[in-house]
């Protein structure tokens, strides 16, 4: 993410009383600023307040900001030691390996609307950037650079059509895991996950 899609108010501005709709805007700011600072991170992940896996606007489950940002309540703030580490973890978070385990451990809200509790996320397997060799890190970061500005279709269409960008991410992650796409049965996994998302959508009606 390069251009911010929204703004957070962190100080007073002229004639701002209607905006706050409160008798003590300064008190709101005093309480809000430490909280915002505590949630700042390079890596932000969907699913804290549910995400629709079948929605046309759902392309990724995590994104990276070049500067730490405090996300809204809809997102998890994933703390990392550096921007590079955030990029490596973003590849994992948007990989099909992670999507599969997320779908197996979701809190289902209805149909394809899913979310994940903090305790659940702490139990899941995660790629450890600190355990990667310099060569594997370099290859993963090259994949990130190659695809970071490329528009991706919806998550469901990525799976249905075996989108090359998803293949590229999964190929790099598979190599970091010491395997390959064929060994891990990734093409078939795409089809299974797409069918499952479509089934969830159709059971509850098209969201």
Show the residue positions of the predicted features:
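Polybasic, glycine- and aromatic-enriched phosphate-binding surface used to engage nucleic acids
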Residues: 1-142, 146
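Non-catalytic DNA-recognition/assembly elements of restriction-modification systems
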Residues: 128-207
């Amino acid at each position: 993410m390069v251009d911010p899609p929204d703004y957070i108010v962190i100080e007073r501005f002229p004639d701002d009383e209607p905006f706050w709709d409160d008798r003590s805007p300064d008190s709101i700011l005093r309480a809000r600023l430490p909280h915002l600072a505590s949630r700042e991170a390079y890596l932000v992940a969907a699913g804290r307040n549910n995400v629709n896996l079948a929605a046309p606007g759902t392309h990724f489950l995590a994104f990276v900001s070049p500067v730490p940002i405090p996300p809204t309540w809809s997102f998890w703030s994933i703390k990392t030691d550096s921007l590079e580490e955030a990029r490596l973890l973003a590849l994992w978070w948007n990989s099909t390996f992670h999507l599969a385990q997320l779908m197996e451990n979701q809190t289902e809200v209805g149909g394809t609307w899913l979310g994940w509790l903090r305790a659940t996320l702490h139990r899941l397997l995660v790629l450890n950037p600190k355990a990667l060799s310099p060569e594997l890190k370099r290859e993963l970061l090259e994949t990130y650079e190659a695809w970071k500005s490329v528009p991706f279709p919806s998550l469901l269409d990525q799976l249905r059509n075996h989108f090359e960008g998803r293949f590229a991410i999964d190929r790099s992650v598979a190599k970091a895991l010491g395997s390959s796409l064929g060994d891990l049965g990734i093409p078939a996994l795409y089809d299974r996950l797409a069918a499952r998302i479509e089934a969830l959508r159709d059971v509850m009606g098209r969201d």
